């Protein structure tokens, strides 16, 4: 049975840490589902982790619908949250239209959007329409061109106070959970203590109710990128390169495929098929 937002919120009540991972396709989603990940994020991070872009900004609603649908087909138990991509929730009407596609066509159970108090009317309207919404504060990747680069947010007293107020406003608007990205650990703890809804941290210290990571980071699939806030639980890049190199070599020396990898037909049938052919 698929997890619900109530299940996720009850994990906070019980003090049970919430593990969340990104997923972008059915195969990976099925693996993570079988491993017991309770919540999967179809992130617009697919832009710089799958599609080859340098940021999340170029990701479209069509991209998100397609990848969300793939994840929904692969995962049978995890709650699936889909990112609303850049400028798809600039107005109430746009937000409702984008959320409808992600849920009806993509099969998501919830959507995630970035921003603080300015997003309150959007969150409230989506919740009124029956759309569970996850908020996102701190560093917001869709605003990369404003930030210049990924950097910790909320270090000053004024910025920290503003983030606390944003978090409370999003909760009051109906958000069921809140991502805190690149936030000082003490501030993330203070926000977590003040909210009834779960906080999900990424680069926000150990005191959030849960953690989310980009799966390519924790599995070591990219040699060129190792953010401080992640831990590599595996180093798959060299294993994959070695396996693929072995495949290329086996094909090159004709040691693969062999008879055990092949099928055969009756010789009489083959002779009949070839009869009269040059």
Swiss-Prot record:
Any idea which positions bind Mg(2+)? 44, 83, 114
Query: Entry's InterPro entries?
Result: Pantoate_hydroxy_MeTrfase, Pyrv/PenolPyrv_kinase-like_dom, Pyrv_kinase-like_dom_sf
Cofactor: bound how, per the entry note?
Binds 1 Mg(2+) ion per subunit.
Q: Does the keyword Cell inner membrane apply?
A: no
Q: Name one Pfam family in it.
A: Pantoate_transf
What is the top EC class of this enzyme, as a single word? transferase
Keywords associated with the record: Cytoplasm, Magnesium, Metal-binding, Pantothenate biosynthesis, Transferase
- What EC number(s) does the entry state? 2.1.2.11
**Per its UniProt entry, which superkingdom is the organism in?**
Bacteria
Q: What is its main location?
A: cytoplasm
Which pathway does the record list?
Cofactor biosynthesis; (R)-pantothenate biosynthesis; (R)-pantoate from 3-methyl-2-oxobutanoate: step 1/2
Provide GO CC annotations from the record.
cytoplasm
Q: Which reaction does it catalyse?
A: 3-methyl-2-oxobutanoate + (6R)-5,10-methylene-5,6,7,8-tetrahydrofolate + H2O = 2-dehydropantoate + (6S)-5,6,7,8-tetrahydrofolate
Q: How does it assemble?
A: Homodecamer; pentamer of dimers.
**What's the stated role of this polypeptide?**
Catalyzes the reversible reaction in which hydroxymethyl group from 5,10-methylenetetrahydrofolate is transferred onto alpha-ketoisovalerate to form ketopantoate.
Protein family according to the UniProt entry: Belongs to the PanB family.
Protein known as? 3-methyl-2-oxobutanoate hydroxymethyltransferase
Q: What is the lineage of its organism?
A: Bacteria, Bacillati, Chloroflexota, Chloroflexia, Chloroflexales
Q: Name the gene.
A: panB
């Amino acid at each position: 049975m698929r997890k619900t937002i109530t299940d996720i919120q009850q994990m906070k009540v019980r003090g049970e840490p919430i593990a969340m991972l990104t997923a972008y396709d059915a195969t990976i989603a099925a693996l993570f589902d079988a491993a017991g990940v309770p919540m999967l994020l179809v992130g617009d991070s697919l832009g710089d982790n799958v599609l080859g872009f340098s940021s999340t900004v170029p990701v479209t609603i069509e991209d998100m619908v397609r990848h969300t649908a793939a994840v929904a087909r692969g995962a049978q138990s995890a709650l699936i949250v889909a990112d609303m991509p850049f400028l798809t929730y600039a107005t109430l009407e746009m937000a409702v239209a984008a959320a409808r596609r992600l849920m009806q066509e993509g099969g998501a159970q919830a959507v995630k959007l970035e921003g603080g108090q300015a997003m309150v009317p959007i969150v409230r309207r989506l919740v009124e329409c029956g759309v569970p919404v996850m908020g996102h504060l701190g560093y917001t990747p869709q605003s990369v061109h404003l930030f210049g680069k990924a950097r910790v947010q909320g270090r000053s007293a004024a910025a920290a106070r503003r983030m606390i107020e944003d978090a409370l406003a999003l909760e009051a608007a109906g958000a069921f959970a809140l991502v805190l990205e690149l936030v000082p650990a003490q501030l993330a703890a203070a926000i977590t203590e003040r909210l009834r809804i779960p906080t999900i941290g990424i680069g926000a210290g150990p005191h959030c109710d849960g953690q989310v990571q980009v799966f390519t980071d924790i599995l070591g699939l990219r040699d060129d990128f190792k953010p401080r806030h992640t831990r590599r639980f595996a180093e798959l890049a060299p294993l994959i390169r070695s396996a693929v190199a072995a495949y290329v070599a086996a094909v090159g020396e004709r040691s693969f495929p062999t008879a055990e990898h092949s099928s055969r037909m009756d010789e009489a049938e083959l002779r009949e098929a070839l009869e009269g052919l040059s």
